[in-house]
Amino acid sequence: MLKARFGGMKPRFAGVVSDNCPRNDAVVAPPKKSPSETVRREGADEVTVIEDFHRIKRLPPYVFAEVNALKAAARAGGADIIDLGMGNPDMQTPQHIVDKLVETVSKPRVHRYSASKGIPGLRRAQAAYYARRFGVKLNPETQIVATLGSKEGFANMAQAITAPGDVILTPNPTYPIHEFGFLISGASVRHLPTSNGDEFLAAVSRACRHTVPKPIAMVLNFPSNPTAMTATRDFYAEAVQLAKQEGLIILSDLAYAEIYFDGEPPPSVLEVPGAMDLAVEVTSLSKTYSMPGWRIGFAVGNERLIA
């Protein structure tokens, strides 16, 4: 039902075009539009009421809010719901992490403002993780920033690199922020079929040839939310080569890096030689350590994009 409602139909909101549109279609951002206003008279005064907000109007319905409303209605009717929706772990956060938090909050200095890009020790820990897990060397001073979860990191990156009229390539179906971050910045989104092989890369190449203006970035999300599809290093190598050829930025969402079942840990796009020239990757502690409410994530990669 959800696929039919949200993933399987042509988008009906501003700034989105699916890959099944005619190849010579131009994809452009909607024209600038001033908020419509109505005037309500109150005594001798005129009060202006703003009815529309341009950026908010560009966003489609938030799928999780709609699903939650359906679940609430079903539960109110007595249904026993097994929730397979949002990736919201219900396992206990590891005890040593909780104990460290309890110890730390008793120190007055931790309640002051933090460094904007995250405290040095946290960024060094992320650099050590990438070196250990992926064999990727990162400079914690210039290539890592701590974020309020991977979602906030992705949204901020999307808004930092795009301007009204820019075109971004995103998989479909995908996690909402992969579109929302760009739409709210005034950019346009072109959907490509979610795939971990030649089909996706061919769609990227085709979109770069036939989209006006030419796309500036593509989104990768493996392991994929919501499909659980994974990617190989070979796929990433081809994606990086294509991005270099077409002048694209790669934004990779690796929030599910540590959830796998076949003995093959998901790779990072940054393992590919040359990826650091054009890619930024976001990760999260939410899924790895069952800490979604803590809001801790990272954006790592190209120095200029991270800065």
Predicted features by range, described:
Residues G7, A14-G15:
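Intrinsically disordered, low-complexity tandem-repeat regions
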Residues E46-G149, N156:
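N-terminal small-domain helix-loop-helix segment of the aminotransferase-like
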Residues A74-G77, S185, Q245-E246:
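Helix C-cap/helix->beta junction micro-motif
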Residues A160-F182:
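Conserved PLP-anchoring active-site segment centered on the Schiff-base-forming lysine
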Residues R190, T194-G263:
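Active-site phosphate-binding strand-loop segment of PLP-dependent enzymes
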Residues E271-A307:
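Conserved core segment of the aminotransferase class I/II
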